[in-house]
Amino acid sequence: EPYRRQRQMCIRDSFQLDSFDKGDYNKAVEQENLARNLVEVLYPNDNHIQGKELRLKQQYFFVSASVQRALARYKKHHDDIHKLPEKVTFQLNDTHPTVTVAELMRILLDEEGLSWDEAWEITTKTCAYTNHTIMAEALEKWPIEIFSRLLPRIYQIVEEINRRFILQIQAEFPGDNGKVARMAIVYDGQVKMAHLAIAAGYSVNGVAKLHTEILKNEQLHDFYELFPQKFNNKTNGITQRRFLMHGDPLLSLIHISEPTRP
């Protein structure tokens, strides 16, 4: 029977016994406490710098763990990393896991030894993006200073993706500097995660017909002009009757069958 796994990512034990034996009890648990902060409470208030940094650390921790786990499972059964898109899709549900794009590129480049073009071809066939909002202010952005300081290698990769993406925009819309400014992934001191997801994803979907039309014609119109083939609608939600029929047909029969009479 088909089923879904839900994984719980945890930190390694980072208790420093040497520091404890020397009487430095605070230092002994310092790293453990810092690491535990990543998984204790998700989505901290990001109105201050500490909250922003913790949120980005959390996002990268869960993304990296998930991507590494997926690739390890793939390589356990398959030898050719180039065929990854035939077996794996990373669904970027809103912008929070969008750093997946750069993390996958990092692994393919630095650990698998692929060229940029090879890694990018695999990544763009493996990642798909779901947008949940038409409000521009809700599309996640990170200050370059924080992003580059906490994730230096990831930022290097994002910069190169941005450089190549800008060249693609300029080739398609020559002389339109306004479009470059609106679509760039790294611009005006910010790393724009939705732009990264659209540039790298093979699919960009809204969650209702009207929502998707607004994305195509208004909010993400520049991207729709460049990538019309990527945009599609996937209506969010499912009725409880359909869910039960598909999820547990035998149980559904109990609910729809005629009641027995004495």
Model features per residue range: what roles?
Residues 1-7, 11, 254-262:
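Single conserved hydrophobic/aromatic residue that forms the stacking wall/gate
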Residues 20-27, 32:
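Compact, glycine/acidic-enriched structural inserts
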Residues 24, 36-40, 105:
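Catalytic alpha/beta active-site cores
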Residues 30-50:
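Residues forming anionic-ligand binding surfaces in small-molecule and nucleic-acid pockets
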